[in-house]
Amino acid sequence: MKKIFFIICMVIFTNTIIAQTFPDSWTDGKYYAVNGAKLYTVTVGTGEPLFIIPGGPGGAHLPYRGLDSLTVNSNIQLIYFDAFGRGRSDTAKDVKEYSLDRDIEDIEGLRKAMHLNKISLLGHSYGSLVAQGYAIKYGQNLSHLVIADGFHSFVMWQENDDNSNHEIKTNYPEVWDTLMKIREQGAISSDEIHQDIYGRVPYGFLYAYNPDRFVGGGGGKPYPNPFNSKLYYQMVGKDGDFIVGSDIGNFDFRKQLKDLKMPILIIAGRFDRVAVPWMQVKYKEYCPQAKFVMFERSGHNPQVEERVKWFSLIKDFMKH
């Protein structure tokens, strides 16, 4: 179900990056050896290091290159990376090597390999799990934390499944009926036919305030392994678009968030049908010390739909 997200996000990248010379994701990156694997990074700008942690799980860094201009007239250095099993980084011989814990430890491994002192993290969607997990375990190494359109627990991720399926059943009954027929025959989320049927639902329907922002474009240079479906279903469970399991079916940060000491910014979109608002606002209870901002004309990607406001918010947050 989520594979389409990273296909569409190639459009986001090509449509939002400004006409300025920045490092090239294909030619200007650097590898670091971390926990027995080579991880690919691209660094933009100078200043306080801010790691951008992609969503998925399974997505590469390229869709987020539209954030490059955060480095203009600011003291921010963006560090993009392809996590283990994604993009240009090494992949596992056994899918069981993929885990949330591994992703968290790889952030710490990258920090050390890059000889950085304190870092900041911006985790989007699934990336927020990695960011929150890192903040809880390695808070002493963290300067700022941004939870962007994120999830605080497996309960919230299950609501993602439930709400998405409800919306599809209600608004795309022909897709839902086809899906139910193959499920009755034994198909599950990780099966290719199941993923293909889910892909008939336009991305913007579930993820956008203005779906037109996510239509067309593309045609750019292919990027290797932009989304690893095998990794995705290893981490969300084999039928993870209906019932979350594996790592995603067990994470829960709700009781620990209130103890975090670093500055925290939590971003949500009013029209997000994935990281749903009624679950997002619970962050105010679980992490009362954070600054919480609801973007009223955005879905799952306020950095695209309310770009100017989003960029201003991040730049201001990173100053303090």
Which residue stretches match the model-derived regions?
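Short beta-strand/loop motif that positions the catalytic acidic residue
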Residues: 260, 266-268
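Flexible "cap/lid" loop of the alpha/beta hydrolase fold
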Residues: 146-188
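Acidic catalytic loop of the alpha/beta-hydrolase fold
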Residues: 271-275
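Conserved acidic catalytic loop of the alpha/beta-hydrolase fold
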Residues: 101-119
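Catalytic active-site module of serine/aspartate enzymes centered on a nucleophile-bearing elbow/loop
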Residues: 290-320
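Conserved hydrolase catalytic core segment
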Residues: 117-161
